[in-house]
A protein has these predicted regions:
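Short, non-transmembrane alpha-helical segments in secretory-pathway proteins
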Residues: 27-30, 34-45, 164-177, 226-264, ...
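Zymogen propeptides/activation segments of proteases
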Residues: 87, 93-112, 130, 237, ...
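Preferential activation on post-signal-peptide N-terminal prodomains/segments
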Residues: 1-234
């Protein structure tokens, strides 16, 4: 995630925090109180959101819109909400702390909270405030062409170089984890070179690159635990990750939730890879994993197994002004720091 902590005389910025990192703990404690006491939600605006970021505040950008109930669970509380938000900010306003939410599109909201400004100040004291800026604050002229909430940490972080191996999961491991008979003889190679394993109506298809897919054919062998008919965001994500983690090679990258959608009968989740909080994106724009739940049954799954290893040397970054100039050629483009996986090389 990206985070910014703003005080009276400076701002701390990070593009590599994770919700389980030690440095996130003060923010997590604050957000637990803010989300737990938020009430009286009302519509707000982009201008109000940006204005709040110039005051004493804590800002978190989760990179993609995620259910508020899932974000609350990451903070250690339960919150009932149908909203999905990409970013939020806890900011001081008229002697109180308000919660501002952005859905990643055109909708903004604001809530009052029971949190005192002194609690926010205590969080600010945990961070060394520098001169991190948002694109909408940039006075050079470069930032005006970018997405307004593009965050420019100063100084720029030093990220390790990553090496990548296109890893394959053994057929035996797949059969075991996905609940197939390990001694099945119902397997063949299709015309495209993929290995296909069939058991009843369930099918595993393994491509030559190691990417595989699974379909249940209506059978209910694989499922996630849920208290009701449809799993909550927490139940779905934790249950699916418990399965996928058994199929991801050991290394310096893990999966994180990219997208969540739920209808009356089904849940669709996509995941990407991240290393130390920095996203790894495939050049073709595809996700690392996609999972469909019918009720609480895993009805379809695909995974692109990759093994990433961090080196001791730093990965070079473009100078900020140069990166802003290049990104600004596309009006409204978001400038962010991440790794790009082109298949055999990683930048």
């Amino acid at each position: 995630m990206r985070a910014a902590v703003t005080g009276e005389y400076g701002r701390y910025g990070s593009i590599s925090l994770t919700t389980d990192s030690e440095s996130f703990t003060p923010i997590k404690t604050l957000l637990r109180e803010v989300l737990g006491s938020a009430r009286s939600r009302m519509d707000s605006s982009a201008a109000a959101f940006r204005s709040a970021l110039g005051k004493p505040s804590v800002y978190c950008d989760f990179l993609e819109p995620l259910p508020v109930s899932y974000l609350a669970d990451l903070m250690g509380i339960t919150a009932e909400s149908e909203l999905s938000v990409r970013a939020l900010a806890a900011a001081e306003q008229n002697g109180q702390v308000v919660l501002l939410l952005w859905d990643g599109g055109s909708r903004y909201y604001q809530c009052v909270t029971a949190v005192q400004p002194s609690t926010l100040t205590e969080v600010l004291d945990h961070f060394e405030l520098g001169v991190t800026a948002f694109a909408f604050e940039d006075l050079s002229g470069y930032g005006q062409h970018l997405a307004p909430l593009s965050l420019f940490p100063d100084p720029l972080p030093e990220l390790p170089q990553l090496t990548v191996t296109e890893s394959t999961v053994s057929t035996e491991t797949l059969l075991s984890v996905l609940g197939f008979n390990p001694h099945t003889n119902s397997r063949y190679t299709d015309a495209g070179g993929a290995e296909v394993v069939v058991e009843g109506d369930r099918v595993i298809r393994i491509s030559g690159s190691g990417t595989f897919s699974y379909t249940s054919g209506g059978e209910t062998v694989l499922s996630v635990e849920s208290a009701g008919g449809l799993p909550t965001p927490r139940e779905a994500v934790s249950g699916v990750l418990e399965l996928l983690d058994q199929l991801i090679p050991e290394g310096d990258a893990r999966l994180y939730l990219l997208e969540w959608q739920q209808s009356e009968t089904a849940t669709f989740l996509t995941f990407g890879y991240q290393s130390s909080g920095v996203p790894i994106r495939f050049a073709d724009g595809s996700a690392a994993a996609e999972v469909t739940l019918s009720g609480n049954t895993i009805s379809a799954l695909s995974l692109r197994p990759r093994q990433y290893s961090a080196a001791s040397s730093a990965s070079p970054l473009l100078p900020l002004r140069q990166a802003m100039s290049i990104a600004g050629r596309t009006e409204g483009a978001e400038l962010s720091i991440g790794y790009a996986d082109t298949g055999c090389l990683l930048y």
